[in-house]
């Protein structure tokens, strides 16, 4: 504020603070795919991006393809515009590209996917599945919304190519969403969209009508923090912390959960997905867990089509201590055993 107060406290361009857009473009470019700053729009968190994309693409009863299960926040944003959801099935490898059939994709406005450490399952798409997905979407002329809030939080396995980069090579339209919430702080409420300029131009109009521009002070502060490679030293610390937290939870589940309960093994991110025995109801289990001061999210709200399994739930391991993780999982395991 002392050095650039007149810029920081004045109205700014809707597209975002220029140096930050340039940083994002450079950060997301590779040796064979170059992103232009003109393809970057700064938004007030990727949640705003989801709402803006819903406003741009969805009319009442428009067909929208989503993973089953999918991110609840996206479903809430899109549902405001009353689409017709078509579920794309998932398995232990995440989204199944073959499910993006000609019948399902006909007339679809877009497909929404989280290829890295998906919320809620924690699963990651393989490079082969990513390639098949963008090729199918290119052939069907369906835009892909790649939501990637957790991509920087890998702590096991090998990094996979982004749908953005694969899509550029395959001729697919990919709209990439990123955020500073998961790598810096969620209270900053700042993210970005990378898309072809024709789409960015439309989104700029939508954003200008919504809030003129994202906070210039916040944009400049984030740029000052990251411009000199702060993330290169900060992210390894975050990854190591989340890795430990994840292992604490997985170890506790292996110790306390009974036979017949299954869960995912995330390579990064913040969540894992639990499947209880068929006869159990996660919503009913939640009420008993809350009485013991343990909380989780039942799986049903993550399904867009109303056909969710009632025996699934999401756990998060990133905001609690090892002691609390082990205590909570022990209680949850006891409650599951009592239900069985």
Residue ranges and their predicted role:
Residues 170, 291, 307-340:
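PLP-dependent enzyme catalytic core of the Aspartate aminotransferase-like
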Residues 194, 273-275, 316-318:
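Short hydrophobic/aromatic beta-strand micro-patches
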Residues 2-141, 145, 151-169, 242, ...:
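Conserved core of the PLP fold type I
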């Amino acid at each position: 504020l002392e050095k650039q107060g007149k810029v920081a406290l004045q109205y700014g361009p809707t597209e975002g603070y220029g140096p930050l857009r340039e940083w994002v473009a450079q950060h997301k470019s590779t040796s064979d795919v170059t992103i232009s700053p003109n393809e970057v729009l700064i938004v007030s968190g990727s949640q705003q991006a989801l709402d803006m994309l819903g406003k741009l693409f969805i009319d009442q009863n428009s067909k929208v393809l989503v993973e089953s299960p999918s991110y609840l926040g996206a479903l809430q944003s899109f549902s405001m515009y009353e689409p017709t959801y078509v579920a794309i099935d998932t398995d232990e490898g995440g989204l199944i590209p073959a499910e993006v059939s000609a019948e399902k994709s006909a007339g679809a406005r877009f497909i929404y996917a989280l290829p890295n450490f998906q919320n809620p399952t924690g699963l990651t798409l393989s490079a082969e599945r990513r390639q098949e997905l963008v090729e199918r979407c290119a052939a069907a002329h369906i835009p892909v919304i790649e939501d990637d809030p957790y991509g920087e939080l890998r702590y096991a396995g090998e990094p996979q190519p982004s749908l953005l980069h694969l899509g550029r090579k395959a001729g697919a339209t990919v709209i990439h969403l990123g955020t500073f919430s998961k790598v810096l702080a969620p209270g900053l409420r700042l993210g970005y969209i990378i898309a072809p300029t024709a789409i960015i131009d439309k989104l700029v109009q939508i954003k200008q009508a919504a809030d003129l521009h994202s906070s210039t002070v916040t944009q400049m502060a984030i740029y000052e923090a990251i411009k000199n490679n702060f993330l290169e030293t900060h992210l390894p610390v975050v990854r190591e912390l989340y890795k430990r937290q994840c292992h604490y939870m997985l170890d506790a589940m292996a110790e306390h959960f009974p036979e017949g309960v299954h869960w995912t093994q995330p390579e990064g991110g913040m969540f894992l997905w639990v499947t209880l025995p068929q006869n159990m109801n996660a919503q009913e289990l939640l009420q008993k867990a809350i009485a013991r001061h343990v909380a989780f999210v039942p799986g049903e709200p993550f399904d867009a089509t109303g056909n969710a399994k009632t025996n699934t739930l999401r756990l998060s391991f990133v905001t609690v201590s090892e002691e609390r993780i082990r205590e909570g999982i022990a209680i949850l395991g006891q409650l599951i055993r009592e239900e069985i």
